[in-house]
Amino acid sequence: MARSGPEVADIFRRYGEAYRAQHTSLSTAQRRVMTAIELCRTAALGGHVEACDQCGHRRIAFNSCRDRHCPRCQSLARAQWLEDRRAELLETQYFHVVFTLPEAIAAIAYQNKALVYGLLFRATAETLRTIAADPRHLGAEIGFFAVLHTWGQNLLHHPHLHCVVPGGGFSPDGTQWIACKPGFFLPVRVLSRLFRRLFLEHLEKAFDGGKLQFFSDLRALNERNAFRRYLAPLRKAEWVVFAKPPFAGPEQVLDYVGRYTHRVAISNNRLVDIEDGAVRFRWKDYRHGDRQKVMTVSTDEFIRRFLLHVLPEGFHRIRYYGFLGNRYREQKLAQCRDLLGMSVPAPSETQAPKEYRDRYEELTGRSLRQCPACHQGQMITIEIFDGVTGPPRCWDTS
């Protein structure tokens, strides 16, 4: 069903051309994202015509852009990802741990996205695995996945990782499952201190290797002593690592995680209106009791904030570690189930790839085949047409 409210695409279509003309320093990736969202589900990308085999009702369906930054193109990808993860759930506690970069580091990250976001993943993974392996804490090999978000509710740059961690892991010899204490994963202060040290070590090494670049108000940091002075107060500051209460059970993990995995900077349902060159959107003010508020910004400022969160092309924002790492996941999960006394899941049946509409209905519970007019007939494709201008040259769906 088509939305009746404002969408990010509406803002880009009305004001995007002027914004691009005024901001010539936009990256190729940012321009491609804007174009993809503007053309999404329009005649420019082509589509098909369907007709009901009972009442003759017709509808035109335009193709989507499939870009991972597009608010309209995430539902099927999210549903497919969650379905894939469902078979991997273990009968144990699950914890949600968030690692956040300080504002001063976030400024460096914005000018060096691929490198610094990669260091965020690396330092987080090393921190969790090191503390979990320490016999003073858990003494086990754990597994987890991490999801990168780069925004806060106000759409400003706020890079942080959401980590979902089963509450336990293998003993050093791999013969036992060592469970966390009920309701407690690992000490947050210990995690925070190690995370701070590891991240700063990796960042300094990157600087020494000539891998960091600084521009505009950070240009002075290209000089070694200035860079070290910039980092000095961060060595003593408290870095935010937040462990949320454990999930009620494995199934609740998927319900919760589904809110995070394929989220974009702002969803269309948070937009209130677009009037007189201004955008109003809903946001939650976490600093004042999670109060729901409405923020008004100019269309230029809205576009600027949205584009802050365009990821480098090919950058993986969901990553897996430990016994959930891609290489040995099936083997390690089988070992987990055995140690936890879980039944062996039935092997999936080999079958031909399903047609898009079948996959959509299976994963979302909503039918694209049923006629929306008579609710009796099936919608049959009677014509396929190409795009008017052709699709964007590059889709980033990673």
UniProtKB/Swiss-Prot annotation:
GO BP of this protein = DNA transposition
Say yes or no: keyword DNA-binding present.
yes
Classification via InterPro entries:
transpos_IS91 (IPR054832), Transposase_32 (IPR007069), Zn_Tnp (IPR026889)
Source domain of life is Bacteria
Record keywords: DNA-binding included? yes
Alphabetical list of Pfam families matching this protein:
Y2_Tnp (PF04986), Zn_Tnp_IS91 (PF14319)
Which GO MF terms does the UniProt record name?
DNA binding; transposase activity
Entry similarity comment? Belongs to the transposase 32 family.
Q: Which PANTHER family match?
A: ISSOD25 TRANSPOSASE TNPA_ISSOD25, TRANSPOSASE
Recorded protein name is: Putative transposase y4qJ
